[in-house]
């Protein structure tokens, strides 16, 4: 029973996250934290443009709150909005920006190179931007744009790589966008940090 409830709650969280991705894409939605409290459910939305989430005189917040309660069965939802510290290092925000640029008709190569450059300039250790679909002509294909260092498999790839996905609806068809970012503060298991001000001891052992 407990396991079933746990799975149900996780599915609900995923559905809410997908709903926010769709409804708040223009606000630069990143992710949300959902926490149960004694007085209800606190939902913290992280977005590049908090004002777009709040809406005029809080109108958007009220709409979101009502939807969460009625359609998702969230008990007494209380929404708080916080800004994303560095949008260019947030994979979901970057993915949405790439998708929006493609929808405006910008060439996919220009969009891909620009996104990679902005992420690396923000200090990332590595980035991959994957654009898939009917980019030119009738045949679908996948284009990858990358720079820096990236973990592709194993536990580090799951835990240390920030991932974001978005969809661009263009005239030729739907284009999928995937972004993976290794942030500058990520410490890899095999990485050693040497402090610049650390004193290096030099020991010489004399032979007898």
Curated annotation (Swiss-Prot):
Domain KH type-2: 16-85
SUPFAM superfamilies the UniProt entry points to: Prokaryotic type KH domain (KH-domain type II) (SSF54814), Ribosomal protein S3 C-terminal domain (SSF54821)
Function summary: Binds the lower part of the 30S subunit head.
GO biological process, alphabetically ordered: translation
HAMAP family xref list: Ribosomal_uS3_A (MF_01309_A)
Organism: Methanocaldococcus jannaschii (strain ATCC 43067 / DSM 2661 / JAL-1 / JCM 10045 / NBRC 100440) (Methanococcus jannaschii)
Protein's name according to its UniProt entry: Small ribosomal subunit protein uS3
A GO CC annotation given for this chain: cytosolic small ribosomal subunit
GO terms for MF: rRNA binding; structural constituent of ribosome
Gene3D superfamilies registered for this protein in UniProt: 3.30.300.20, Ribosomal protein S3, C-terminal domain
InterPro entries: KH_dom, KH_dom-like_a/b, KH_dom_type_2, KH_sf_prok-type, Ribosomal_S3_C_sf, Ribosomal_uS3_arc, Ribosomal_uS3_C, Ribosomal_uS3_CS
Keywords of this entry: Ribonucleoprotein, Ribosomal protein, RNA-binding, rRNA-binding
PANTHER family: 30S/40S RIBOSOMAL PROTEIN S3, SMALL RIBOSOMAL SUBUNIT PROTEIN US3
NCBIfam families: PRK04191.1, uS3_euk_arch
Oligomeric form and interacting partners: Part of the 30S ribosomal subunit.
Keyword RNA-binding appears in the UniProt entry: yes
Family: Belongs to the universal ribosomal protein uS3 family.
